[in-house]
């Protein structure tokens, strides 16, 4: 069953029905558009929320992230930010795959419907024109036939009139014959117009309009199928991101399970342990023996009052550092050597300072080596550059290295005084001579920074930091991993400096995120590169 056969006389109904279908497409587009606006606003609000509660760089809150419960909250914020990104992706895909496509299809349907209705209108106008011609021919035939009948009656009357002349009778008969002939022509024309109209009407109702109605039916069915696809796509768009949203939710759950209350307590101890011994018992001062009072006051080495540890009331609470404490320095606080800190914290700060300066020295040595190689290239190929132009940079790098070596030795001596570890720090780099250029006589780039206690009196500390090896040990040591990570999503690693990874792959973390959103990792085969921090779950070694 089709429209052309069953609804041949329902042109107005089909006109309204097809228009209603186009209105539905437009309505659905507006609905999806408003849905995308809601998703965009929702994602924006989620991002603002995570930004509001995320710790600012260098703030106290960021320092608190060393505790697992604080880090878990930060992980939840990161997962929420990724979740917001998925909501944005839903809105973007709905806009592109549904709204844009349906809008384009709607314009095509409007043009097609307009064309079909225009064809129907032309056929209708053509049939009406034929009917008008038929009606005119019919009226003319009717009028001429009446005139012919009148002429015939007049001729008969004239013929019977005794007073009429022969000429009058002949003239009346000729007029009647002429009218009859004209009436016959009109009759034939009317018959021809009637035949033509009947043929056109048959063509109109049995061929032209059914074809047009069937085309409208085909157009409407295609529209309905397209709408069905749009309805399915509306759900599929969100369903496609559900696995990633599930990963985000799993990450939030994982953040909660990774909280370790006992470990947080240990971190607090490690962070704030002073290293001081608890105060001992106070000696009894016998004031009843007046003669020995002065000698007792001078001989006793105990504090004259208790150490105030907790509160402000001197009679009830104690504070570790008060004005009379034997630990309070008489001179200004030495912040450079961290002598103002408790012993345990001082050792940690000194070790951290040594590690930071060691990394900085390594960078300067790498830069000096690169400048030396560049200078060699310029000397061999003058057209590539002037070797003398590198002298300022080489000199500056050498000064920086000398300064850092001196600072490093100073901090290592302080660490030794504080009872810290005195193990040396090794670097994998080629030895650098005093002017900063590459030394071709060096067998290996490894150099060892010794603490001052490890040097003899005759040894120059600035020269004793180098240790030579054989030529075959030229390869650089790999940085020690500081943790590991598990990939949450696939990452192609197509950009320079990045590395690809597959979901679930475990990689070693070499360098943590510096705030730019990238973490440096290494595979078991030695391949290194950067990955997006948000694409992996990262666990750093404690």
Curated annotation (Swiss-Prot):
Q: Which InterPro entries match?
A: AH/BAR_dom_sf (IPR027267), F_BAR (IPR031160), FCH_dom (IPR001060), HR1_rho-bd (IPR011072), SH3-like_dom_sf (IPR036028), SH3_domain (IPR001452)
Q: Which GO terms describe its molecular function?
A: lipid binding
Which GO BP terms apply?
endocytosis; signal transduction
Q: Which residues form the F-BAR domain?
A: 1-264
The listed locations are: Cytoplasm, Cytoskeleton; Cytoplasm, Cell cortex; Lysosome; Cell membrane
Q: What's in the keyword line of the UniProt record?
A: Cell membrane, Coiled coil, Cytoplasm, Cytoskeleton, Endocytosis, Lipid-binding, Lysosome, Membrane, SH3 domain
| Coiled-coil ranges from the UniProt annotation | 67-259, 335-423
- Site note Mediates end-to-end attachment of dimers applies to 166
Q: Give the REM-1 domain ranges.
A: 340-417
The segment(s) forming the SH3 domain are 480-541
Record's domain comment?
The F-BAR domain binds the phospholipid membrane with its concave surface. The end-to-end polymerization of dimers of these domains provides a curved surface that fits best membranes with around 600 A diameter, and may drive tubulation.
Q: What does this protein do?
A: Required to coordinate membrane tubulation with reorganization of the actin cytoskeleton during endocytosis.
- Summary of subunit composition and partner proteins: Homodimerizes, the dimers can polymerize end-to-end to form filamentous structures.
- Protein name listed in UniProt: Cdc42-interacting protein 4 homolog
Q: Which organism is it from?
A: Danio rerio (Zebrafish)
């Amino acid at each position: 069953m089709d429209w052309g056969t069953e609804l041949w006389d329902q042109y107005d109904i089909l006109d309204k029905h097809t228009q209603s279908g186009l209105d539905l497409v437009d309505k659905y587009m507006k609905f999806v558009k408003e849905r995308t606006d809601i998703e965009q606003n929702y994602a924006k609000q989620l991002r603002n929320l995570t930004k509001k509660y995320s710790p600012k760089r260098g703030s106290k809150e960021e320092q608190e992230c060393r505790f697992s419960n604080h880090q878990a909250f930060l992980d939840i914020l990161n997962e929420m930010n990724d979740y917001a990104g998925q909501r944005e992706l839903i809105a973007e895909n709905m806009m592109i795959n549904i709204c844009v496509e349906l809008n384009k299809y709607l314009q095509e349907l409007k043009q097609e419907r307009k064309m079909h209705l225009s064809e129907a209108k032309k056929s209708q106008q053509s049939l009406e024109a034929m009917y008008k011609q038929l009606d005119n021919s019919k009226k003319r035939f009717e009028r001429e036939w009446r005139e012919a009948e009148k002429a015939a009656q007049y001729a008969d009357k004239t013929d019977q009139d005794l007073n009429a002349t022969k000429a009058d009778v002949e003239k009346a008969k000729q007029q009647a014959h002429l009218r009859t002939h004209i009436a016959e022509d009109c009759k034939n024309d009317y018959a021809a117009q009637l035949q033509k109209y009947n043929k056109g009407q048959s063509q109109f109702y049995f061929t032209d309009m059914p074809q047009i109605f069937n085309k409208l039916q085909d157009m409407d069915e295609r529209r309905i199928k397209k709408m069905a696809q749009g309805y399915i796509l509306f759900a599929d768009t969100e369903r496609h991101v559900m696995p990633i949203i599930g990963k985000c939710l799993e990450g939030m759950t994982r953040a909660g399970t990774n909280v370790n209350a006992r470990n947080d307590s240990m971190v607090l101890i490690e962070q704030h342990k002073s290293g001081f011994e608890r105060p001992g018992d106070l000696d009894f001062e016998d004031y009843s023996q007046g003669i020995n009072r002065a000698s007792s006051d001078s001989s006793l080495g105990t504090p004259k009052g208790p150490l105030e540890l907790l509160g402000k009331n001197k009679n009830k609470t104690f504070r570790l550092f008060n004005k009379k404490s034997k630990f309070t320095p008489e001179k200004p606080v030495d912040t450079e050597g961290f002598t103002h800190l408790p012993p345990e914290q001082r050792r940690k700060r000194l070790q951290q300072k040594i590690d930071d300066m060691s990394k900085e020295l390594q960078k300067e040595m790498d830069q000096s080596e690169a400048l030396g190689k560049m200078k060699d290239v310029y000397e061999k190929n003058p057209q590539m550059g002037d070797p003398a132009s590198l002298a300022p940079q080489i000199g500056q790098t050498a000064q920086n290295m000398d300064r850092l070596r001196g600072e490093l030795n100073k901090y290592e001596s302080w660490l030794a005084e504080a009872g810290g570890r005195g193990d040396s720090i090794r670097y994998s780099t080629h030895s650098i001579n005093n002017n900063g250029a590459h030394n071709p006589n060096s067998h290996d780039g490894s150099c060892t920074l010794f603490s001052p206690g490890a040097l003899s009196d005759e040894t120059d500390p600035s020269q004793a930091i180098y240790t030579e090896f054989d030529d075959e040990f030229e390869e650089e040591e790999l940085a020690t991993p500081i943790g590991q990570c598990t990939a949450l999503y696939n990452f192609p690693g197509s950009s320079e400096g990045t590395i690809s990874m597959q979901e679930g792959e475990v990689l070693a973390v070499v360098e943590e995120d510096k705030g730019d959103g990238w973490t440096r990792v290494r595979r078991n085969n030695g391949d290194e590169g950067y990955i997006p921090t948000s694409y992996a779950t990262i666990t750093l070694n404690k």
